[in-house]
């Protein structure tokens, strides 16, 4: 895993410290163990998790400056991308939001095992925005949750004025972007 991560991070221009790489390895091991009984992710195996989860999520760090930002990951699932961002850039203040309590329990356990600070795991539906979280974040991220128009409606209310929303989408998203333009302008 270290070689895959090392090569991948170098290609992205990211230089995580040894502690971050160690935490990603521990994350992988615990994810694989718990995935056997919880169905956290369809992607498994060292190489696939390293490339398709860890490096894919870490690539967000090349999009904008996350340092010392307050970030929410809406529909985090097994912690993608939010937990990976937190591990690679620990100074992020992150909230992991998911509607399934079993995932939030897993993320709480994982955060504790990795001794992560400034991380909050919240069990809630994205559309049920608690008042204290409305307009409270600098950055909202989401990966593999819903179509872009729906994501705009779910994620944008969490952002402060001037905040950034980053939706991780596949290469064939042009139709989704065109479809979501109205929602983006209205919100």
Where are these regions (language model features)?
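S-adenosylmethionine
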Residues: 91-95, 99-187
């Amino acid at each position: 895993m270290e070689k895959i991560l090392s090569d991948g991070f170098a290609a992205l221009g990211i230089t995580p410290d040894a502690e971050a790489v160690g935490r990603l390895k521990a994350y992988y091991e615990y994810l694989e163990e718990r995935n056997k009984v919880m169905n956290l992710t369809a992607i498994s195996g060292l190489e696939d998790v390293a490339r398709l989860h860890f490096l894919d999520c870490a690539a967000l760090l090349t999009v904008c400056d996350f340092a010392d930002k307050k970030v929410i990951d809406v529909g985090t699932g097994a912690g993608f991308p939010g937990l990976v961002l937190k591990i690679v850039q620990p100074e992020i203040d992150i909230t992991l939001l998911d509607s399934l309590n079993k995932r939030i329990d897993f993320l709480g356990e994982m955060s504790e095992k990795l001794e992560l600070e400034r991380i909050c795991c919240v069990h809630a539906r994205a559309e049920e925005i608690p008042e204290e979280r409305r307009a409270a974040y600098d950055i909202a991220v989401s990966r593999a949750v819903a179509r872009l128009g729906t994501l705009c409606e779910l994620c944008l209310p969490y952002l402060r004025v001037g905040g950034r929303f980053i939706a991780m989408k596949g290469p064939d998203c042009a139709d989704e972007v065109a479809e979501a333009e109205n929602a983006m302008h209205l919100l």
